[in-house]
């Protein structure tokens, strides 16, 4: 079961012409071509997006410890004794 031979391709073409008509075939081929072109463009855009995301990763922000937060809060509010 490999590629169809020339005679088999002619039979397939004849069936397609009978099913869709000679006028519809160019429209179908054009639609298929546009679909393939759009698919390839979206795949390229997806690859570009992943490259941009990986290149633009930022360094993680520093997480303050509870002691640092407490010392900042205590310096902001005056203590009353």
From Swiss-Prot:
**Cellular component annotations (GO), alphabetically ordered:** TAT protein transport complex
Name any Gene Ontology BP term.
protein transport by the Tat complex
Which is a Pfam family this sequence falls into? TatA_B_E
Subunit arrangement?
A: The Tat system comprises two distinct complexes: a TatABC complex, containing multiple copies of TatA, TatB and TatC subunits, and a separate TatA complex, containing only TatA subunits. Substrates initially bind to the TatABC complex, which probably triggers association of the separate TatA complex to form the active translocon.
Positions of the UniProt region annotated as Disordered = 45-81
Specify whether Transmembrane helix is a keyword of the entry: yes
Q: Report membrane topology.
A: Single-pass membrane protein
Q: Which gene encodes it?
A: tatA
Q: Where is the composition biased (Basic and acidic residues)?
A: 59-75
Q: What is this protein called?
A: Sec-independent protein translocase protein TatA
**Which HAMAP family would you find in this protein's record?**
TatA_E (MF_00236)
- From which domain of life does this come? Bacteria
